[in-house]
Regions:
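Structural motif
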Residues: 3-5, 30-34, 74, 82-85, ...
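Short acidic, glycine/serine/threonine-rich loops at helix termini
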Residues: 16-20, 26, 43-48, 121-126, ...
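Short acidic/glycine-rich loop or secondary-structure boundary segments that cap or lie
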Residues: 42-44, 93-95, 111, 118-122, ...
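Thiamine diphosphate
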Residues: 1-42, 97
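Short, hinge-like loop/turn segments at secondary-structure boundaries
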Residues: 24, 49-53, 102, 127-130
Length: 196
């Protein structure tokens, strides 16, 4: 058995390669997808990414981003990932626990990891020193338990941290494919409802 870990950014994981993310989730392929979400194309000169908040400066939105931003975890859940979690570089111990739990899950494990980009997002949006960028992330996050207790109005602009979705019943793609292969070899009738 191989344990595949794919690391992407918010740009390549949700825009340029977003189709791969969506169909990996849909099929529930047994891999671990760590999306490093710093809210901007940080390594390619600061373009707007799918998670860039409204109003933020980028080189492709020099008067402020007008695009609505994605919630990567909602996308992964809706697309069919069987394990979805969000963590932050501010809480490395909790992030490690999420990785341990997700890596042992049999199916598509998606991790949205909020990370700072103090130069291309922070400085260029006048957030101040690097620590201010971390404080900005901290101010936009809370535990899932606390998030669930907030009113709809209080939830606006806040992201829950922790395991957000887990489906232990959904069959992993290669196991479903193997069942079809075995049934075809023995001329058995395939019950496709069991493979969902």
């Amino acid at each position: 058995d191989k344990h595949v870990i794919v690391v992407t950014g918010d740009g390549d994981g949700l825009a340029i390669g977003g189709n791969h993310t969506i169909h990996g989730c849909r099929r529930n392929i047994g891999l671990n997808h760590i999306l490093i979400n710093n809210f901007i194309y940080a390594l390619t000169n600061s373009q707007t990414s799918p998670t860039t908040p409204k109003g933020m400066w980028t080189v492709t939105a020099q008067y402020g981003n007008i695009d609505p931003s994605f919630d990567a975890c909602k996308l992964a859940t809706a697309a069919g990932a069987s394990f979805v979690a969000r963590g932050s570089v501010i809480e490395p111990e909790k992030l490690t626990k999420l990785f341990v739990e997700g890596f042992s899950h049999d199916g598509y494990s998606f991790f949205d990891v909020f990370s700072n980009c103090h130069i291309n997002l922070g400085r260029k949006n006048k957030m101040g020193e690097a620590v201010k960028n971390l404080e900005w992330i901290k101010g936009r996050t809370t535990s899932k338990v606390k998030f669930d207790m907030l009113s709809d109005e209080e939830k606006k602009g806040i992201f829950p941290l922790g395991v957000l979705h887990k489906d232990e019943e959904k069959i992993e793609y290669t196991k479903a494919y193997d069942k079809v292969r075995r049934a075809a070899m023995s001329n058995e009738v395939i019950n496709f409802e069991e493979l969902v």
